[in-house]
UniProtKB/Swiss-Prot annotation:
Its EC number is 3.2.1.21. It catalyses: Hydrolysis of terminal, non-reducing beta-D-glucosyl residues with release of beta-D-glucose. The lineage of its organism: Bacteria, Thermotogati, Thermotogota, Thermotogae, Thermotogales. It comes from Thermotoga maritima (strain ATCC 43589 / DSM 3109 / JCM 10099 / NBRC 100826 / MSB8). InterPro entries: Glyco_hydro_1, Glyco_hydro_1_AS, Glyco_hydro_1_beta-glucosidase, Glyco_hydro_1_N_CS, Glycoside_hydrolase_SF. This is Beta-glucosidase A.
Length: 446
């Protein structure tokens, strides 16, 4: 039997996000988030779904951590809800919010599970959106203040931190496409958000160095594997643009090299703040690791009539329930590419997974062989990247639980644990048992 063994100490994890699983968004003195107001506005989310209940993790957190323990998973990546901690975004700290996350952190540590905390996974306090949110330069100060509260309260026990989850999605899907909160469609606002996200990230890293002496901090990006529709120069250039704009370079180029990538500047210089370069020296704060999220690949071509002159070409490939093409070698490509381009000291796959139309069978189980196949193929490609020298230190499945999939509501299931939303019953899917075995063996059996 051929076993693909991972390095000793490799961290196998599962991931979630606050608004997607917690429910009870206003409980115990929490403030409103932009996802609360956005999802409560008719037409924004499929079927009118909201995160009011979600997986009720706010009340069932203990049961959910017991599932992680039972599966033998070694790390749990979760996010903290900014408005639970600072209901107005700044100023008054809500002790009951701190208490909730303290219970989670302490329980994880008791069970030998390493917490990876995401400081911001999209649920901005609505009070700050009223002041302009990510488009307001002051948000770097607000974010630094919020981060300091987290580091001072949790930094004694939490040693692995992520400043931002997928800042491209925050800026572009939230402020240009209008599909995510706050639901804006303004390219100038979107690129100001890109810039302010970088400034906020750097400020948080700076505060981290002052407050947590023995931890690591990084940032997480969404990535696609873009391939050209032909060998034509214009299609190859379209791929380069998509990589620089859509993937990690949009943010890592400023962090490592002090400017936005070349093709992004060509496209977006006029949308960025006039004197954006004045901020670049502070943006270049050193980070300890890069987190990459990867789900899918895309065939792209030059299209003179499309925004940014790029459009997607559909391929006859297997797809997930999201309609995303399954291209496992993309995870290998993105890992190799980040090493080649920026050579970060450590890399994590902070999300990888798939939505399928899962059903509970008559035997009470969820037989999601398609998800097992997806995970196995991607983990195998990640293993290959390690063999070729990529400093990959861990892998997190998205997600532990089926949950509120943003604008798709509850219609898309990503979990390795099934959630029956009418009863909140949890059922470990076949993929959950399979993944448990991968963790136990620290590798894949062919």
């Amino acid at each position: 039997m051929n076993v693909k063994k991972f390095p000793e100490g490799f961290l196998w994890g599962v991931a979630t996000a606050s608004y997607q699983i917690e429910g009870s968004p206003l409980a115990d003195g929490a403030g409103m988030s932009i996802w609360h107001t956005f999802s409560h506005t008719p037409g924004n989310v499929k079927n009118g779904d909201t995160g009011d209940v979600a997986c009720d993790h706010y009340n069932r957190w203990k049961e959910d951590i017991e599932i992680i323990e039972k599966l033998g998973v070694k790390a749990y990546r979760f996010s903290i809800s900014w408005p639970r901690i600072l209901p107005e975004g700044t100023g008054r700290v809500n002790q009951k919010g701190l208490d909730f996350y303290n219970r989670i952190i302490d329980t994880l540590l008791e069970k030998g599970i390493t917490p990876f905390v995401t400081i911001y996974h999209w649920d901005l306090p609505f009070a700050l959106q009223l002041k302009g949110g990510w488009a307001n330069r002051e948000i770097a100060d607000w974010f630094a203040e919020y981060s300091r509260v987290l580091f001072e309260n949790f930094g004694d026990r939490v040693k692995n931190w992520i400043t931002l989850n997928e800042p491209w999605v925050v800026a572009i899907v939230g402020h240009l496409y209008g599909v995510h909160a706050p639901g804006m469609r303004d390219i100038y606002v979107a690129f100001r958000a890109v810039h302010n996200l970088l400034r906020a990230h750097a400020r948080a890293v700076k505060v981290f160095r002052e407050t947590v002496k023995d931890g690591k901090i990084g940032i997480v990006f969404n990535n696609g594997y873009f391939e050209p529709a032909s060998e034509k120069e214009e299609d190859i250039r379209a791929v380069r643009f998509m990589h620089q704009f859509n993937n990690y370079p949009l943010f890592l180029n400023p962090i490592y090299r002090g400017d936005y990538p070349e093709l992004v500047l060509e496209f977006a210089r006029e949308y960025l703040p006039e004197n954006y370069k004045d901020d670049m020296s502070e943006i270049q704060e050193k980070i300890d690791f890069v987190g990459l999220n990867y789900y899918s690949g895309h065939l792209v071509k030059f299209d003179p009539d499309a925004p940014a002159k790029v459009s997607f070409v559909e391929r006859d490939l297997p797809k997930t329930a999201m309609g995303w093409e399954i291209v496992p070698e993309g995870i290998y490509w993105i890992l190799k590419k980040v090493k080649e381009e920026y050579n970060p000291p450590e890399v994590y796959i902070t999300e990888n997974g798939a939505a399928f139309d899962d059903v509970v069978s008559e035997d009470g189980r969820v037989h999601d062989q398609n998800r097992i196949d997806y995970l196995k193929a991607h983990i195998g490609q990640a293993w290959k990247a390690i063999q070729e020298g990529v400093p990959l230190k861990g892998y997190f499945v998205w997600s532990l639980l089926d949950n509120f999939e943003w604008a798709e509501g509850y219609s898309k299931r990503f979990g390795i644990v099934y959630v029956d939303y009418s009863t909140q019953k949890r059922i470990v899917k076949d993929s959950g048992y399979w993944y448990s075995n991968v963790v136990k063996n620290n590798g894949l059996e062919d």
